[in-house]
């Protein structure tokens, strides 16, 4: 479970479980920059309004009242995010929240909001993410799995493979459909999990479709492997996995969520 957050004056910031003061963040930042791309920039698209409520067969992950479907970074402890007015808001001190239930293929809907008073720039501005299959922590401080990025990209320049709706550090979104900070936005995600052979080798990769505010950003995109801040993505064998909402370590005000549901496929 995340105990303490420290912020470092580097260009790239990530979500942490534990920290070590002797890490060379300048050196890590330079390594991470090798997999950041700034062109071509996705076109800006003005999105429509919010969709309807969950369908009758959906599994409700957040009903506006409780977080009974989730636990904290430590699976023995409850999710630590606060609920107010039917909305949950990231608590960066307690870390991310993880579903108790595990999934393979699914359709997911979630609504999220960048705070009106957002500050910062690039990746340090309203950063969060949806891990479609969360696989634990890598190297003690990096989240492992497949991440769809959440970020304030309304007039906020960053590397395009880290933009809102990217498969982080892998697939650039087809458009920028971000609304102004303070407005509710939504993702509709179709996830087809990877399959593995008995010996652990990859049989078929994962594929993901992402619509942001009704605008197609990822169209059955092949996922190349686990999200990596530094280096290239790769696969490790796994089965059904939980979904995680990220508590990113940047110093900007936290992201909020509501109306989260999933339909196993």
Regions found by a protein language model. Name each.
Residues 1-22:
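Bacterial Sec-dependent N-terminal signal peptides
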Residues 21-265:
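Carbohydrate-interacting regions of secretory-pathway proteins
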């Amino acid at each position: 479970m995340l105990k303490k957050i420290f912020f470092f004056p580097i260009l790239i910031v990530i979500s942490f479980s534990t920290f070590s003061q002797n890490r060379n963040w300048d050196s890590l930042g330079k390594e991470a920059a090798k997999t950041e791309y700034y062109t071509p920039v996705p076109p800006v698209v003005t999105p429509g309004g919010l969709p309807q409520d969950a369908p009758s067969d959906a599994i409700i992950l957040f009903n506006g009242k409780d977080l009974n479907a989730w636990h904290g970074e430590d699976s023995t402890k409850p999710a630590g995010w606060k609920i107010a007015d039917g909305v949950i808001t990231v608590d960066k001190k307690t870390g991310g929240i993880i579903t108790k239930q595990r999934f393979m293929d699914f359709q997911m809907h979630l609504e999220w909001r960048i705070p009106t008073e957002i500050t910062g720039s690039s990746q340090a501005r309203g950063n969060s993410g949806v891990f479609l299959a969360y696989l634990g922590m890598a190297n003690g401080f990096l989240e492992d799995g497949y991440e769809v990025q959440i970020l304030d990209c309304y007039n906020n320049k960053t590397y395009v493979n880290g933009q809102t709706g990217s498969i982080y550090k892998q697939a650039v979104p087809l458009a920028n459909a971000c609304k102004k900070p303070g407005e509710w936005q939504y993702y509709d995600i179709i996830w087809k999990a990877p399959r593995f052979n008995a010996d652990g080798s990859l049989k078929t990769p994962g594929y993901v479709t992402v619509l942001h505010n009704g605008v197609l950003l990822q169209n059955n995109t092949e996922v190349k492997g686990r999200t990596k801040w530094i280096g290239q993505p790769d696969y490790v064998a796994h089965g059904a996995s939980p979904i995680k909402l990220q508590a990113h370590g940047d110093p900007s005000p936290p992201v909020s969520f509501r109306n989260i549901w999933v339909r196993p496929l």
